[in-house]
UniProtKB/Swiss-Prot annotation:
The cysteine framework is I (CC-C-C). Alpha4/3 pattern. GO terms for molecular function: acetylcholine receptor inhibitor activity; ion channel regulator activity; toxin activity. Disulfide bonds join 6-12, 7-16. Expressed by the venom duct. The modification Cysteine amide is found at residue 16. GO terms for cellular component: extracellular region; host cell postsynaptic membrane. The keyword Transcription does not apply. Negative results: does not inhibit alpha-2-beta-2, alpha-2-beta-4, alpha-3-beta-4, alpha-4-beta-2, alpha-4-beta-2 nAChRs. This is Alpha-conotoxin ImII.
Amino acid sequence: IVRRACCSDRRCRWRCG
């Protein structure tokens, strides 16, 4: 449920697209 924070994270950014 954390998409904006993921987009800002380099490790989770790949999940943003």
